[in-house]
From Swiss-Prot:
Regions that span the bilayer: 31-55, 69-89, 109-130, 152-173, 204-229, 260-283, 304-325
Cystines in this chain: 107-184
Membrane topology: Multi-pass membrane protein
Tissue specificity statement from the Swiss-Prot or TrEMBL entry: Principally expressed in the tubules of the renal medulla. Specific expression is seen in medullary and cortical thick ascending limbs; lower levels are detected in cortical and inner medullary collecting ducts. Not detected significantly in the glomeruli. In the brain, expressed in all types of glial cells.
GO molecular function: prostaglandin E receptor activity
Similarity remark: Belongs to the G-protein coupled receptor 1 family.
Subcellular localization(s) per the UniProt record: Cell membrane
Glycosylation: residue positions: 16, 193
Keywords in alphabetical order: Cell membrane, Disulfide bond, G-protein coupled receptor, Glycoprotein, Lipoprotein, Membrane, Palmitate, Receptor, Transducer, Transmembrane, Transmembrane helix
Protein name according to UniProt: Prostaglandin E2 receptor EP3 subtype
Amino acid sequence: MAGVWAPEHSVEAHSNQSSAADGCGSVSVAFPITMMVTGFVGNALAMLLVVRSYRRRESKRKKSFLLCIGWLALTDLVGQLLTSPVVILVYLSQRRWEQLDPSGRLCTFFGLTMTVFGLSSLLVASAMAVERALAIRAPHWYASHMKTRATPVLLGVWLSVLAFALLPVLGVGRYSVQWPGTWCFISTGPAGNETDSAREPGSVAFASAFACLGLLALVVTFACNLATIKALVSRCRAKAAASQSSAQWGRITTETAIQLMGIMCVLSVCWSPLLIMMLKMIFNQMSVEQCKTQMGKEKECNSFLIAVRLASLNQILDPWVYLLLRKILLRKFCQIRDHTNYASSSTSLPCPGSSVLMWSDQLER
């Protein structure tokens, strides 16, 4: 979804003429290129780190957790590589999308790709939050009942989302060129030359289902992460009362709580505006396709474009909030602690080193 990062003025919003895009030179095309490169680097680093950690792990549960993170990074990476080059091509050609894709097949592929990789990322993040909450709040039940391997679950989620995204190909829903004319996504209402009564019920149902599924995934993720934080705090207090490495438990709890809150903040900032705005536009019987033919839609169109840009940021931030940033912070913590210990010649708790799953090792005890 990184490809939608481009200036609003790159295509004339209120004209049906087949004119070249305004400002589609090297400056405007730098946006999607920068987003694609940034996302590629972050997700590629995350995947390399997951592969290295996966080979050193013996516990199936730890391997499942790493597999989920790796799958999330792979999903974000492939989604960017499939969409960004298309948008870059549109900008470099300085032609309207309809001229480059008169059959509409590329638009359908682009919209399907954004739907599959956007929604699957949300659902995988939600599944990870559920598993994390069960493992921490009910460890004995989790150990005895959760025998399902991660790979079938991840494949099931991806195939289910793919089947859902294929509905417009079967006639339920519609993918259309979105303002300013450099990308395609789910249509939320009538096209620019249609009236309100011309809306297809299938398009409304499909767009509503996407928004509701996304919001449901966000709610589940939030609820599970909050439940996990609460359980961690309660266990930390119990350990402190029993004087069982209270300092270490306090540090682990703080680090994990900060990471989970960071995940919630990133998801809410990146996805909530788009999903809520889609429902609002469906309710108001509006589509950003109308921006090309109707005056007075500038505010709504700009807001929707900003919301999509925020959603595209999620693919770049995912590897950092789930893996890379935590690893960097842990390594920095070890460096500071080792320096302090050397200066004071005092003993301390063992350093987690490069282990990304240090906190999960401790929580299982």
